[in-house]
Amino acid sequence: MAKPSRLFVIILPMLNKLFLVLLLLAIGSSVRAQDKTPQTYNAEGVSIEFTAKPASPEFRQVVAGEEATLRFKITGSNGGVPLTNLRPVAWLDQRQSKDSITARECREMVQSFLQPSFNKRPTLDLNAYFILTLNNEPNISVIDPLSGFGGSKLYTLIPLASYGEDWVLTADNKRLYVSMPAANELAVIDIPTWKVIDRIDVGAMPTRLALQHDERYLWIDNTAGSSAESRVTIVDTVTLKVVKQLVTGLGHHEIAFSDDDRLAFITNDETRTVSVVDVRKLQVLKQISTGISPAAIAFSSLSQTAYVAVAGDGTIMAIGGPRHEVIARIATEPGVSVLGIPATGHYGFALNPKTSKVYVFDLSSNRLVQTVPVGPGSDQISFTQQFAYVRSTGSEFVTMIKLADIGKEAAVTKFPAGQRAPAESALSSHAAAIVPAPEDGSVLVANPADKMIYYYTEGMAVPMGSFQNYRRDPRALLVIDNSLRETTRGVYSTTVRLNTAGRYDVAFLLDSPRVVNCFELTVAENPNVPKKTETAIKIEPVVKEAVANAGTRFNVRFKVLDAKTGTAKTNLEDLNVLVFLSPGIWQQRDFAKSIGEGVYETSFVPPSAGVYYVFFQSASLGLQFNQSTPLTIQAVKN
C-alpha cells in the first residue's frame, strides 16, 4: 500500500482545523442570528417587531444579571411606514410553566397589570418611573408613584454614610453620584440594584457636583471656606478614582462646561474669580476677576458664552470669545445668586432672593429684557417646554412664568405646593426641588417642611396629587423614567436587567389602535452570577391590601404554602414573626398562631403612621428572616 504523500499529511490536519473553525463560526452565527431574529405580530393594520439582545458585546444572548436592550419596531402593515409618537406599554413576567400562554391568557395578564391591586404584579414593569428624594436623614427614598403594596408607595430606601448634599444622574439612568459633606465622600449608586457600589474619599466637604456632557469626568466642589482644603476634585467615572485635585481658588465653587467639554468654568467665591480650565490637560488657563461673591455660573449653547452671577454688585458677567474674556456686563441688583438657562430658547434667568425678583436677559444681545416679581427667598428655577418654575423658600407658592410671553407682559401664575414654606425645614440642598415629570406639562415639587412631594399639571389651579415621604424631609428630587422611549422613528426601546434566568412573557399593549400581544424572552444562566436559592415555602397574605390604624391592634393573617405544590403547611410551632417600622426605628417579635388549614395569625399595635414590614423565620422549614419576602402594611393616623 502506498504511503500518503508528505503534502497530503500536512494538508489534512489543516483542512480538519479549517472545517472545525468554519463549523464553530457557523454555530456562533446561528446563535447570534437566533438572538437577533425578531418576533413579529400583525393586527389592526399595525406590525410590531420585537427583539432582545445583550447590551454588552461580550454576550451572544440575554443572560441573567446583565443588561439587555428590548426593542419594539412599530410600522404600518402596508408599506412598513414607521409609526411615531406612540405610547406603547409593556411588562415582563417570568413564566411558571413550559407552555406558551394563549391569546386569552395574554389579554387577562395585561388586564391584571393595569389594575392597582397587587394580586398579580409583573416581574418587571417597563412603564414605571421612580421618584427619588434626597432626605434630611442619611438616606434616599425611592418612591413608586404608580403603585404600592398595601397602600405604600415607598419602593426602597438607599442608606448613605451621611446626609447627601447634591447628586447627578448619568444619561442612561444607571448610575447616581451623591456628595456627602459630613463623610467627605462621594457615594456611587447602581440604579438597577439600588445599591451603593462604591464610596470614594474626595476631600473636605464635597458639595456641588458637575458631570461632563460626555460623562468622562465628575467634578466636585470642596467647599472649605478660606482653608487650604478648598479645591475642585476630579473623579474618573470609569475607574472611580480621583485623577486630580485642582486648586482654582478659595471658597464655594460652581462649575459649568462648554458644549464640547473642552473648557470648564469654575467660580471661586472667596477669591472673587472665575477659573477657565483646559479639561484635556486639567490645567487652569486663566483667572478672571469678578468682584464680590461670584455665586452662580451657567453656559449657553446658543451664544457659546458662560454667564456668571455676581451677588456683590448684581452684575451678570458674560465670558466668551476665543480669549475667554468678559464680553458683556448685564446690570441687575445686589443679591443675584441663581442662574438658569433652558436647553432651548433665547433667554437666561437670574434669581435674586433678596429682592424677590427674576431678571430675564437676552442670550444673543446680552441685554436685560424683563424683571418679574416672584415669591420671597426665591432660590431655584426649573424649566419645562412651556414654563419656568421658581421655588421660593419663604412661601409655599411656586411661581410660573410662561416662556412664550417673555419680552411682553409676562404671564405669571402661582400654585400652592403644600401648606408650609420650605424654609421651615432645617436643611436645604443645592439640588433641584422642582423637576419635570415624565408626562409632558407636569412637574414634581418637593416641600421639605410638609414632608411631601406634590404633582402639578400645567393649567391647573392646585396640584393634582401628592406623595408622602414617610416622615422624612425631601430636600431634592430626581425622576428615573424606565418607560419605553422612541429612540429612532417608530422604534421604542429600553434597557433592562433581569437577575433570574428562565423564560419570560413580554406583554405588550398599544392603546390606539388597540393591540395586545405577548412575545417571548429567554434569559440564560450567567456563570458569573450565583443561582438564586429558592425557599421551600411561600407566604401569602389573606388580605391582599392591608391598611392599619396607628394605635389600634391589627391582626395579620397569612397562608404558608409549599412553594412547588401549593399544599398548605399546617401546625407549625416555630414560625417566628418580625414586624418593624421603616427605617427600623421600632420592631416587635412574636410567634405566629395556627388557626387551621395553613393559615396563621399574629398581631401588633402600630405605634405611629408609617410603613411596616413583616418577615418570617422557621427553623423546621430552614427559613431565615432574610430569605422571606416580607409583607408590607401601611399604617395611617386613626
Where are these regions (language model features)?
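Hydrophobic h-region of N-terminal signal peptides that target proteins for export
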Residues: L23-V31
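Edge beta-strands of extracellular beta-sandwich domains
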Residues: V516-E525, Q624-A635
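Enriched for extracellular/lumenal, surface-exposed ectodomains of secreted and cell-surface proteins
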Residues: L510-R514, F616-G622
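Surface-exposed loop/edge segments in extracytoplasmic proteins
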Residues: K153, G584-D590
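Sec-dependent signal peptide recognition
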Residues: R6, L15-V21
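Predominantly soluble domains enriched in secretory-pathway, periplasmic, or organellar proteins
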Residues: Q34-P513, N517-T522, T533-N555, A563-N571, ...
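Conserved aromatic beta-strand anchor motif in extracellular beta-sandwich/beta-rich domains
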Residues: V577-L581
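Short, positively charged and aromatic/hydrophobic N-terminal segments
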Residues: V9-I11
